[in-house]
Curated annotation (Swiss-Prot):
Family the UniProt entry places it in: Belongs to the class-I aminoacyl-tRNA synthetase family. Glutamate--tRNA ligase type 2 subfamily.
GO molecular function per UniProt: ATP binding; glutamate-tRNA ligase activity
Pfam families (alphabetical): tRNA-synt_1c, tRNA-synt_1c_C
Keywords: Aminoacyl-tRNA synthetase, ATP-binding, Cytoplasm, Ligase, Nucleotide-binding, Protein biosynthesis
Protein name (record): Glutamate--tRNA ligase
Length: 551
């Protein structure tokens, strides 16, 4: 019991400087509701623990704060966010796959597939395969850099694939299965134009090429592979049911001619499989046991089941989930982002205004936060609309405990404190969770934000942990004590001229001004600019540059 109470005493004291009996009692009772009957006894223990903690040396208090760090609490919370069990899953026998098209870097939307499939592989001690579905060198043309970007971001999110497959390097395998289907009479070469075949498809009639002999079909197929035909002249179709209630399932295209150099395999091939064909073959060959994908791909399963039926294969257990719409990003496609980068609207794929994982990494998001965010959404079939504020909340739980605090004065206004009796070294919290401190010089020439100056000019304000002044360009010193200033109401942050350096924040929220010199030691880390936002310090050369993380 005492151990539990001391944990909350330490956490509360670390956060607020002094432990509150009421706050600690609330935490203890929430964790152990059965103790409500013994509230008086528990309160006495709380008082005792607070007294004991306050009597400890600063060094011992720091050690206790580390011991009871709320990072472990955040990890426990993440562990409780479990996915529902997979139908028909057995430990050690589950094989999951994440199959992106590498036509750009992974986005926040990609993270959902990476995380959910990766978590199920971990949950069942199974196998996790990353397969690049990169067999469209034109419409969804792969970016050569994106292959590596995907692998980097997958590792950053905490997953190590057991196998990495590049579909474009396995095209002869798909040719072999296409030939088998032709020989079985289940696929045919079709010379109809798109418009002509649409008429047959919509009316449910067979096109004239459907019943050409296997021998003639094989001859056309070989000529396709040799490059004898032009793009759009002929395709290979899978025979399904031309009377199927869904026209999209009727004799779908399995291979088409694309005379375009591929970033990975060059000009080696001119006939490429469609995603539905390639994916169907690979899922079988790789032994995929479960597929989790968007409900917009239900037709893909219906098409692919024809191939599985023809070969006598068992289709993987499939679960379709609803779309996730994130309000703040709207409909940003990879192709539109690429155009905007080329036009100079964005500086690159890691521009902090973009929804790419590279951008979120640059902003200082923790992978555990992204993981927690998506696990909380689950894998239901209903569409979900969600705000980035939910992700911010998850990230804040983690970074708030690690981020050092500094002052950033955006739109600085210079102030001279009149009648300041002496320079004073001011001690401020560096990290309230660890009890560490930082120091600033309390001197006559300081800076405050333009916002604060215009809002509070002519009023008595408290310069945080320093002194009280009557705010003006020539600010009258009003004492060092907190008395006379409404608690929290007119407390503003400030910077001494001697410890201010140029700084700016870039990204979703941009600002320029002056930054506390102490912040240069945190390059590469997320900090909290008090009363502004969490930001990741990116560089500190001629000026300090920080990337906006979130409020």
């Amino acid at each position: 019991m005492k151990e539990v109470i001391m944990k909350y005493v330490v956490q509360n004291a670390a956060k607020y400087g002094k432990a509150s009996e009421k706050a600690v009692m609330g935490k203890v009772m929430a964790e152990n509701p059965e103790l409500r009957k013994k509230a008086k006894e528990v309160l006495e223990l709380v008082k005792e623990c607070i007294t004991e903690f306050e009597a400890l040396s600063e060094e011992v208090r720091k050690e206790l704060i580390k011991k009871y760090s709320m990072d472990s609490e955040a990890k426990r919370e993440l562990e409780t966010k479990k996915l529902p069990e997979l139908e028909g899953a057995e430990k050690g026998k589950v094989v999951m796959r994440f199959a992106p098209n590498p036509n750009g870097p992974p986005t926040l939307g990609s993270a959902r597939g990476i995380i959910v499939n990766g978590e199920y592989a971990k949950m069942y001690e199974g196998k996790y395969i990353i397969r690049f579905d990169d067999t469209d060198p034109r419409t969804k043309r792969p970016m050569i850099e994106a292959y590596e970007w995907y692998l980097e971001d997958i590792e950053w999110l905490g997953y190590k694939p057991d196998e990495v497959i590049y579909a474009s390097r396995r095209i002869p395998i798909y040719y072999d299965y296409a030939r088998k289907l032709i020989e079985m009479g289940k696929a045919y070469t079709c010379f109809c134009s798109q418009e002509e075949f649409k008429k047959f498809r919509d009316s449910g009639e067979e096109c004239p090429h459907r019943n050409i002999s296997v021998e003639d079909t094989l001859e056309v197929w070989e000529r396709m592979l040799e490059g004898d035909y032009e793009e759009g002249e002929v395709v290979l179709r899978i025979k399904t049911d031309m009377r199927h209630k869904d026209p999209a399932i009727r004799d779908w295209v399995a291979f088409r001619i694309i005379k375009e150099s591929h970033p990975l395999v060059g000009d080696k091939y001119v006939v490429y499989p469609t995603l539905d064909f390639e994916s169907a073959i690979e899922d079988h060959l790789l032994g995929i046991t479960h597929i989790i994908r968007g409900k917009d791909l239900i037709d893909s399963e219906r098409r692919q089941r024809y191939i599985y039926e023809y070969f006598g294969w068992i289709y993987p257990i499939t679960k379709h989930w609803g779309r996730v719409k994130i309000f703040e990003f709207g409909k940003l496609s990879t192709s539109s982002i690429k155009k905007d980068i080329e036009r100079g609207k964005y500086e690159g794929w890691d521009d902090p205004r973009l929804p790419t994982l590279r951008a979120f990494r640059r902003r200082g998001f923790e992978p555990e936060a992204i993981k927690s965010f998506f696990l909380s959404l689950g894998v239901g079939e209903n569409d979900v609309s969600v705000s980035l504020k939910n992700l911010y909340a998850e990230n804040r739980k983690i970074i708030d405990r690690k981020a050092n605090r500094y002052f950033f004065i955006w739109g600085p206004v210079k102030i001279e404190i009149v009648n300041l009796p002496e320079k004073k070294e001011v001690e401020l919290p560096l990290n309230p969770h660890t009890g560490e401190k930082r120091r600033l010089k309390g001197e006559r020439t300081i800076y405050v934000t333009k916002d604060d100056f215009e809002r509070l000019k002519g009023q008595v304000v408290r310069l945080k942990d320093f002194c009280n002044v009557l705010l003006d360009e020539k600010a009258e010193f009003m004492g060092f004590e907190l008395e006379g200033v409404k608690k929290g109401k007119n407390i503003i942050h400030w910077l001494p001229e001697s410890e201010a350096i140029k700084g700016k924040v870039i990204g979703e929220r941009e600002a320029e001004g002056l930054v506390e010199r102490n912040a240069v030691r945190d390059v590469g880390k997320v900090v909290q600019f008090e009363r502004f936002a969490f930001c990741k310090v990116e560089s500190a050369d001629e000026e300090l540059v920080a990337v906006y993380t979130h409020p």
